[in-house]
Amino acid sequence: MNGTRNWCTLVDVHPEDQAAGSVDILRLTLQGELTGDELEHIAQKAGRKTYAMVSSHSAGHSLASELVESHDGHEEIIKVYLKGRSGDKMIHEKNINQLKSEVQYIQEARNCLQKLREDISSKLDRNLGDSLHRQEIQVVLEKPNGFSQSPTALYSSPPEVDTCINEDVESLRKTVQDLLAKLQEAKRQHQSDCVAFEVTLSRYQREAEQSNVALQREEDRVEQKEAEVGELQRRLLGMETEHQALLAKVREGEVALEELRSNNADCQAEREKAATLEKEVAGLREKIHHLDDMLKSQQRKVRQMIEQLQNSKAVIQSKDATIQELKEKIAYLEAENLEMHDRMEHLIEKQISHGNFSTQARAKTENPGSIRISKPPSPKPMPVIRVVET
């Protein structure tokens, strides 16, 4: 805006007979210098109040803007349409967009009101010192054409214009109070959403840490089981070797016994030796039977240990899947948190930049960035160990 020569007006341009479910339109009007005839024509149309409006549909709509010109060619209009959002967006993204739209509208209304107050104060201070040439101040607040700033219209003011000014000031004051209340409510809602997000993120992190500890314990148990299985297999191989050696001794004893029986059946010494060999053979058979029982028992234990090992590996795989899901959730929430912070920073910068008025207002729409989180490949299945009895 150039000093006191230009005004910015935020008005509602939808017709009076508009349906309840139709699209709301907000118009920003930039008005420059006008001639006396044009100002008189504008003053005749100043029958309705100018007000700033925040659409109640902004909670579930996105913004679309359009730059057009009015019929008389003296003002530039930016129409902001509120359209429906897609249903697959997250709830907190909708809340952020709603806050962004409401804060933008509130900031525009606040800036317009502040500019109006400054201009009125400056004109009052300047015109009160010059009592000979300037007796009254006329401020016309007109719905389609904004504020009148022509010096020729400031010298005379009828009583009807003063009444309209008072009503417009009261209306703007109430509107600003409502907008400030909505801004405070939106800030409180945003703070509560941030606290809930932090609590959820902390809970997910605790669950991930607990899952990591449980996974480490299961891995230690699996390593211990594998060591025990290796020791049992080593003992089993030793017992099998000993079993083969005992069988060879039994065969040798039987061959020697048969030779002794065939050579000299009447020799006492041979008989005693044969009896001794028979006793040894009986003892060896008992040992072989005992070793067979022990071997079968060890095989059963090995099978049980292998089953336990497979069950433990299955549990570890399920824990890995759970941890991976939790990591994906944490990554997704962190990405959303970063996006939320970026949008809030952008909103704050945009609010600060609105303090300096430009000659033309332009609307920009932003598409939220998408973050794709690739899912890591699933772990390979563990090998199956089988023990075959011989």
UniProtKB/Swiss-Prot annotation:
The keyword Coiled coil applies. InterPro entries: Tuftelin_GRINL1A/MYZAP/CCD68. Keywords: Biomineralization, Coiled coil, Palmoplantar keratoderma, Secreted. The gene is TUFT1. Involved in the structural organization of the epidermis. Involved in the mineralization and structural organization of enamel. It comes from Homo sapiens (Human). This is Tuftelin. Belongs to the tuftelin family. It is found in: Secreted. PANTHER family: GDOWN1, TUFTELIN. Interacts with TFIP11. GO terms for cellular component: cytoplasm; extracellular region; I band; RNA polymerase II, core complex. Its main location: secreted. Expressed in the epidermis (at protein level). Present in the extracellular enamel and is mainly associated with the crystal component. It comes from the Eukaryota. Residues 88-126, 162-351 form a coiled coil. GO terms for biological process: bone mineralization; odontogenesis. GO terms for molecular function: structural constituent of skin epidermis; structural constituent of tooth enamel. Residues 358-390 are annotated as: Disordered. It is linked to Woolly hair-skin fragility syndrome: An autosomal recessive genodermatosis characterized by woolly hair texture with slow hair growth, and skin fragility present at birth or appearing in the neonatal period. Skin fragility then resolves or only persists as minor skin peeling, predominantly affecting the palms and soles.
